[in-house]
């Protein structure tokens, strides 16, 4: 049984569970969030930033 524990420990050290991509990290999800920010009423299309006050729902920089 201890050999199995050692093998499991070695496998987890070589391939940690944090190396697996999460659903929120997918490029498709990031593009969808970016599109939502561009449709935000405070988003300035020309300057590509959010007008002040910058809400949390806007994913871009604040214009200032």
Curated annotation (Swiss-Prot):
One of its GO terms (molecular function) is ion channel inhibitor activity. InterPro entries: Conotoxin (IPR004214). Disulfide bonds join 49-58, 50-62, 54-63. One of its GO terms (cellular component) is extracellular region. It is found in: Secreted. It comes from the Eukaryota. The modification Cysteine amide is found at residue 63. Residues 1-19 form the signal peptide. Residues 20-47 form a propeptide. Contains 3 disulfide bonds. Two peptides are produced from this precursor. Conotoxin Tx3.5-b is amidated at Cys-63, conotoxin Tx3.5-a has an unmodified C-terminus. Pfam families: Conotoxin. Keywords: Amidation, Cleavage on pair of basic residues, Disulfide bond, Secreted, Signal, Toxin. Expressed by the venom duct. Is present in all duct parts with a highest content in part 2 (proximal of the venom bulb) and then decreases in concentration toward the end of the duct. Belongs to the conotoxin M superfamily. The cysteine framework is III (CC-C-C-CC). This is Conotoxin Tx3.5-a. It comes from Conus textile (Cloth-of-gold cone). The lineage of its organism: Eukaryota, Metazoa, Spiralia, Lophotrochozoa, Mollusca.
């Amino acid at each position: 049984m201890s050999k199995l524990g050692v093998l499991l420990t070695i496998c987890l050290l070589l391939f940690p569970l944090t190396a697996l991509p999460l659903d929120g990290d997918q490029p498709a999800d990031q593009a969808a969030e970016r599109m939502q920010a561009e449709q935000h009423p405070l988003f300035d299309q020309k300057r590509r930033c959010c007008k002040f006050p910058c809400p949390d729902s806007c994913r871009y920089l604040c214009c200032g």
